[in-house]
């Protein structure tokens, strides 16, 4: 394989991994530990 192909595959894989981790953090099990400032502010 050429160097450009390997670089493109590694960058794409890193981007997909980061996106998956961000979605898991936002909506998965760790999301229950996040605080919601709008719920804390009572009107």
Curated annotation (Swiss-Prot):
Subcellular location: Plastid, Chloroplast thylakoid membrane
InterPro entries, alphabetized: PSII_PsbN
GO cellular component annotations of the record: chloroplast thylakoid membrane
Principal cellular location given in the protein's record: plastid
Keywords (A to Z) from UniProt: Chloroplast, Membrane, Plastid, Thylakoid, Transmembrane, Transmembrane helix
Segments traversing the membrane: 5-27
One Gene Ontology term from the biological process aspect of the record: photosynthesis
Membrane topology designation: Single-pass membrane protein
Function: May play a role in photosystem I and II biogenesis.
Similarity remark: Belongs to the PsbN family.
Protein name, per record: Protein PsbN
Encoding gene per record: psbN
